[in-house]
């Protein structure tokens, strides 16, 4: 079985002192880049999709594509619902075969966040589906959800333990100073907060908003307990900019099989670097 849950992946990463990258994909080409690169580097990876991606590509289509590529490359893959907010939407996709879910209602008050997350956990665990949730809130925009910098807040380590125990989640996404999107300047990550969270929470920890972080910062977060690194914007930017450049230089180009190659190559460079930064090459 090549389509797997993230639970074992992240537990292996936790024991091994590395992180598993979760790459947000959008179509056939972006998925090809992630899977082909991961297979060539023998690295465990997570294929992540926001609600918008699943709407764009179709849940059944994405599931079939992940399954086919996992078998083709003899490489274990996990497909993950990223930043999903609605129970019915999650339930439908779980019934379609998705094995990993992020329920994100971190904008709600603490008690409501617990209640909504626990409802999803209770349902998903019946199907052996792993669940990630977020405590604290990142600034920036992910899909159609935008959080102003003033409304972002960091994860409280003591609350994090209560949250993890009350919900039964399998992994916890933390807010320590990252944001969705690219950074105008390098963020100042709160490493001491992350270290405290690890001491209070006995779960794999997840870092969102990793696009544009330095290798040094990524590797320091892994040392302090991060087991899953989410990358989205950096992939889109590399793909899109290379495509724009190619079409500007070759205005006569009309064959997608040709002009998409430069976009895939640029994105492949990002995927390779993230895998190396996460220390997961050769771990699949």
Swiss-Prot record:
<dbReference type="InterPro" id="IPR013785">
    <property type="entry name" value="Aldolase_TIM"/>
</dbReference>
<dbReference type="InterPro" id="IPR050246">
    <property type="entry name" value="Class_II_FBP_aldolase"/>
</dbReference>
<dbReference type="GO" id="GO:2001059">
    <property type="term" value="P:D-tagatose 6-phosphate catabolic process"/>
</dbReference>
<comment type="function">
    <text>Catalytic subunit of the tagatose-1,6-bisphosphate aldolase GatYZ, which catalyzes the reversible aldol condensation of dihydroxyacetone phosphate (DHAP or glycerone-phosphate) with glyceraldehyde 3-phosphate (G3P) to produce tagatose 1,6-bisphosphate (TBP). Requires GatZ subunit for full activity and stability. Is involved in the catabolism of galactitol.</text>
</comment>
<comment type="similarity">
    <text>Belongs to the class II fructose-bisphosphate aldolase family. TagBP aldolase GatY subfamily.</text>
</comment>
<feature type="binding site">
    <location>
        <position position="180"/>
    </location>
    <ligand>
        <name>Zn(2+)</name>
    </ligand>
</feature>
<keyword id="KW-0862">Zinc</keyword>
<feature type="binding site">
    <location>
        <position position="83"/>
    </location>
    <ligand>
        <name>Zn(2+)</name>
    </ligand>
</feature>
<dbReference type="GO" id="GO:0005829">
    <property type="term" value="C:cytosol"/>
</dbReference>
<keyword id="KW-0298">Galactitol metabolism</keyword>
<feature type="binding site">
    <location>
        <position position="208"/>
    </location>
    <ligand>
        <name>Zn(2+)</name>
    </ligand>
</feature>
<dbReference type="Pfam" id="PF01116">
    <property type="entry name" value="F_bP_aldolase"/>
</dbReference>
<dbReference type="InterPro" id="IPR023955">
    <property type="entry name" value="TagBP_aldolase_GatY"/>
</dbReference>
<feature type="binding site">
    <location>
        <begin position="230"/>
        <end position="233"/>
    </location>
    <ligand>
        <name>dihydroxyacetone phosphate</name>
    </ligand>
</feature>
<keyword id="KW-0456">Lyase</keyword>
<dbReference type="GO" id="GO:0019404">
    <property type="term" value="P:galactitol catabolic process"/>
</dbReference>
<dbReference type="InterPro" id="IPR011288">
    <property type="entry name" value="TagBP_ald_KbaY/GatY"/>
</dbReference>
<dbReference type="GO" id="GO:0008270">
    <property type="term" value="F:zinc ion binding"/>
</dbReference>
<dbReference type="GO" id="GO:0009025">
    <property type="term" value="F:tagatose-bisphosphate aldolase activity"/>
</dbReference>
<comment type="pathway">
    <text>Carbohydrate metabolism; D-tagatose 6-phosphate degradation; D-glyceraldehyde 3-phosphate and glycerone phosphate from D-tagatose 6-phosphate: step 2/2.</text>
</comment>
<protein>
    <recommendedName>
        <fullName>D-tagatose-1,6-bisphosphate aldolase subunit GatY</fullName>
        <ecNumber>4.1.2.40</ecNumber>
    </recommendedName>
</protein>
<feature type="binding site">
    <location>
        <position position="181"/>
    </location>
    <ligand>
        <name>dihydroxyacetone phosphate</name>
    </ligand>
</feature>
<keyword id="KW-0479">Metal-binding</keyword>
<feature type="binding site">
    <location>
        <begin position="209"/>
        <end position="211"/>
    </location>
    <ligand>
        <name>dihydroxyacetone phosphate</name>
    </ligand>
</feature>
<feature type="active site" description="Proton donor">
    <location>
        <position position="82"/>
    </location>
</feature>
<comment type="subunit">
    <text>Forms a complex with GatZ.</text>
</comment>
<dbReference type="InterPro" id="IPR000771">
    <property type="entry name" value="FBA_II"/>
</dbReference>
């Amino acid at each position: 079985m090549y389509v797997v849950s993230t639970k074992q992946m992240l537990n292996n990463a936790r024991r091994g002192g590395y992180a598993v990258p979760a790459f947000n994909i959008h179509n056939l080409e972006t998925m090809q880049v992630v899977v082909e690169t991961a297979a060539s580097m023998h690295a465990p990876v997570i294929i992540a999709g926001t609600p918008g991606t699943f709407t764009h590509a179709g849940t059944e289509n994405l599931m079939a594509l992940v399954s086919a590529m996992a078998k083709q490359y003899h490489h274990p893959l996990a497909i993950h619902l990223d930043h999903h907010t609605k129970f019915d939407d999650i339930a439908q996709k779980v019934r379609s075969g998705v094995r990993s879910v992020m329920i994100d209602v971190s904008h709600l008050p603490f008690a409501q966040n617990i209640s909504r997350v626990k409802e999803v956990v209770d349902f998903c665990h019946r199907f052996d589906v792993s669940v990630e949730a977020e405590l604290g809130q990142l600034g920036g925009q992910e899909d159609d959800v935008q959080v102003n910098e003033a409304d972002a807040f960091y994860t409280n380590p003591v609350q994090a333990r209560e949250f993890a125990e009350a919900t039964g989640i399998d992994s916890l996404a933390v807010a320590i100073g990252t944001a969705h999107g690219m950074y105008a300047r390098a963020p100042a990550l709160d490493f001491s907060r992350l270290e405290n969270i690890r001491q209070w929470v006995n779960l794999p920890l997840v870092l969102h908003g990793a696009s544009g972080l330095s290798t040094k910062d990524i590797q320091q977060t892994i040392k302090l307990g991060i087991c899953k690194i989410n990358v989205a914007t950096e992939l889109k930017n590399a793909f899109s900019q290379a495509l724009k450049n190619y079409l500007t230089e070759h205005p006569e180009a009309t064959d997608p099989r040709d002009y998409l190659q430069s976009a895939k190559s640029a994105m492949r460079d990002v995927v390779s670097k993230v895998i190396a930064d996460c220390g997961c090459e050769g771990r699949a």
